[in-house]
Amino acid sequence: MNSLENLILVGVIKSCHGIKGHIILKSFTIPTTKILERNLVNESQENINIKLISQNAKGELICTFNDISTRNEAENLKGYKLFCLRASLPELEEDEFYIADLNHLTILDQDHKKVGKIKNILNFGAGDIIEIEFLDQTTELLPFNKQFFPVITKNYGILNYKREV
């Protein structure tokens, strides 16, 4: 396993906030404040120190970041990714997955023939949506539930869906 496979993306710095070097953090944890309980690292596995200042109406966290104290320094952090070590995360239940483990997962049809792969996982507030890239390079969005994906393993997912061609 390479070093990035040992990391789980848990947040990204969206922008700066104010003149004191605060950042707006988009957390991928549920609840969003759960990210503050993790030991955060960057891609080089260097420790990151984040402290919560407040939370805005969108659920984004306004935080201090390491020793950043000016708006100019904070502006340079836009897009900065925050990770935690996979080994530090809790064990999952049988039907639970980390998004990082689903990305690029092979998708099979009911006859176990490869039909594509997961291209992206989206969530607009009503549940996870899976973007599938089919072998013909077309994509479709489907809800991530047992009706469409009755079987998911670490190696593949079974798709219960007939495409309109």
Swiss-Prot record:
It comes from the Bacteria. SUPFAM superfamilies: PRC-barrel domain, Translation proteins. The keyword tRNA processing does not apply. Keywords: Chaperone, Cytoplasm, Ribosome biogenesis, rRNA processing. GO terms for biological process: ribosomal small subunit biogenesis; rRNA processing. The PRC barrel domain binds ribosomal protein uS19. This is Ribosome maturation factor RimM. The lineage of its organism: Bacteria, Pseudomonadati, Pseudomonadota, Alphaproteobacteria, Rickettsiales.
